Amino acid sequence: MTNLLNKSLEENGSFLTAVYIFVGFVALYLLGRALQAFVQAADACCLFWYTWVVVPGAKGTAFVYNHTYGKKLNKPELEAVVVNEFPKNGWNNKNPANFQDVQRNKLYS
């Protein structure tokens, strides 16, 4: 750094070297302001999407779930089927459920 400064002082003189250093600091200042504006805009964008999309979406999803799937059915026979008959661990189920064919009164799996 001092080598560059000494070279500039020799070739350009002290006044132009001071001007170049000043212009460099102004450029750094403007770059910082541009980055600050960019970060502020990105922050406002994230805050907008979080406030108007993410939170209402999560609240809406919770509302729909609580008033549909999350609601207790108060139908014991249906709840017994849901709990006891359907496979509990997907494709790894060793005991597949028996479903009753209502019209033929026959069990098949």
UniProtKB/Swiss-Prot annotation:
Topology versus the membrane: Single-pass type III membrane protein
TM region positions: 12-32
Pfam families noted in UniProt: IBV_3C (PF03620)
Compartments (UniProt record): Host Golgi apparatus membrane
Keyword Membrane: yes
Principal subcellular localisation of the protein: host cell
Region (Disordered), start-end ranges: 89-109
Residue ranges, Virion surface side: 1-11
GO biological process, one term: viral budding from Golgi membrane
Bias (Polar residues) ranges: 90-109
Entry GO terms, CC: host cell Golgi membrane; membrane
Function of the molecule: Plays a central role in virus morphogenesis and assembly. Acts as a viroporin and self-assembles in host membranes forming pentameric protein-lipid pores that allow ion transport. Also plays a role in the induction of apoptosis.
Subunit structure: Homooligomer. Interacts with the M membrane protein in the budding compartment of the host cell, which is located between endoplasmic reticulum and the Golgi complex. The cytoplasmic tails of both proteins are important for this function. Interacts with Nucleoprotein.
Protein name in UniProt: Envelope small membrane protein
Species, as recorded: Avian infectious bronchitis virus (strain KB8523) (IBV)
